[in-house]
């Protein structure tokens, strides 16, 4: 089980300056030294490198685009197999209602339970309805990861209306809730922790210096 506390997402996509399994492993080490209780990472290669540096539990994903589908986070059994081979403790997958490239969400959950019963499963959702559905499918964790990132939640953001969406998810599901997506300040982290989430994933605000730099620049340029 993931412990309570801060999980740091250490990811860099191919078009980003820090794209490297070695760099992500050192980012994870820095997060561990700073007090993180877990890591979220993308690709089998990154996860294997990270596990060489830290013994923290890892939430694993594989981001891969499929034609005709907007689902790209651990979309099929192919990605699941890669994550099982990586040895990660938790597999996270897109649990939205968007068109899937291959297996149904229910089929993927069953596949993981059958093939790797020791691995926990996290649902990345964007609506309360998706959270309730994930709860019915017996996901171990439900994360607010994709709020604002699906076509039907575009324009929304996790912290709007004093985290109203997160509060509703917490109220409606029995699974452990993970706050993720635009938790961008220590104050926000404290707020969601006080609301009762099991743990919180913070990524860009800690591990993406390009984004952090842009935020500083934008603050000065705003009139």
Swiss-Prot record:
What GO cellular component entries does it have? cytosol
- Report the record's disulfide bonds: none
- Give me the segments passing through the membrane: none
Known EC number: 5.1.3.9
Which reactions are catalysed by this chain?
an N-acyl-D-glucosamine 6-phosphate = an N-acyl-D-mannosamine 6-phosphate
Q: Name one GO biological process term.
A: carbohydrate metabolic process
Keywords of the record, alphabetical order, are: Carbohydrate metabolism, Isomerase
Judged by the first EC level, this protein's enzyme class is: isomerase
Sorted alphabetically, which InterPro entries does this protein's record hold? Answer: Aldolase_TIM, NanE, RibuloseP-bd_barrel
Q: In which pathway does it act?
A: Amino-sugar metabolism; N-acetylneuraminate degradation; D-fructose 6-phosphate from N-acetylneuraminate: step 3/5
Q: Name one GO molecular function term.
A: N-acylglucosamine-6-phosphate 2-epimerase activity
Highest taxon of source: Bacteria
Describe the task this protein carries out. Converts N-acetylmannosamine-6-phosphate (ManNAc-6-P) to N-acetylglucosamine-6-phosphate (GlcNAc-6-P).
**Family classification:** Belongs to the NanE family.
- UniProt xrefs under HAMAP family: ManNAc6P_epimer
| Protein name as catalogued | Putative N-acetylmannosamine-6-phosphate 2-epimerase
Give the species this sequence originates from: Staphylococcus haemolyticus (strain JCSC1435)
